[in-house]
Design a protein with these regions (language model features):
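Membrane topogenic/interface segments and analogous intrinsically disordered interaction regions
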Residues: 1-196
Length: 196
């Protein structure tokens, strides 16, 4: 499954390679580790939820259920976005940089690590609205502060888009726009759950 973005590009003279003698084993181990992290994320969140649940009030328990459901959902939406959208864009960008006289043969271990890193980062970035909700309920952040910081957030998202995506304006915007939408969703959630 993780090789599908490369297969879809239908590259000529392309093959992944294992340079070190331990690379085949390490590739499978890293795939297993990252796959386990992605699949176990709901369980990790559930364990945190179970630890906190007995010590809070009934109203807070309702918030906690809401946070749990949305946290898991947003994580998987982020992972899907990273895998189906951002990973193919970044691979096609790197492939475009290759000279015709060069055979594109990246190390399999490097490709697997890069792919899973990108997918996990997207999943974690999609936790922004949940983080806004938690920090609002803990009275660390408030709706007004998030609203005031909107212009700074836009700049930060554009910079992150430039760093994490290929250096063309379209890819930068394709990463920055979802981040901005998540930020606005965080502001909206913070507004709904603000202290009245």
């Amino acid at each position: 499954i993780i090789m599908q973005p490369i297969i879809d590009l239908d590259l000529k003279n392309f093959q992944l390679q294992d340079i070190k003698i331990t690379s085949p084993f390490m590739a499978k181990a890293i795939m297993a580790l990252f796959s386990a992290l992605i699949v176990c994320f709901p369980y990790i969140i559930f364990e945190i939820y179970s630890f906190i649940y007995p010590a809070i009030s009934k109203i807070s328990k309702i918030y906690l259920v809401f946070i749990f459901i949305f946290s898991v959902s947003f994580f998987f939406v982020g992972c899907i976005f990273g895998y189906s959208f951002l990973l193919p864009i970044s691979i096609s960008f790197f492939v475009r940089l290759i000279d015709d006289s060069v055979i594109f043969a990246p190390e399999r271990l490097n490709y697997i690590f890069y792919s899973f890193w990108l997918i996990l980062v997207c999943g974690l970035i999609y936790q922004l609205p949940i983080i806004s909700l938690i920090l609002t309920k803990l009275k660390i952040l408030n709706y007004e502060f998030l609203k005031q910081m909107r212009s700074y957030a836009i700049v930060i998202f554009l910079v992150l888009g430039a760093i994490l995506s290929p250096p063309d304006p379209l890819s930068q915007l394709l990463l920055a726009i979802p981040l901005y939408v998540l930020y606005e969703l965080g502001i909206f959630i913070s507004y709904i759950f603000r202290e009245k």
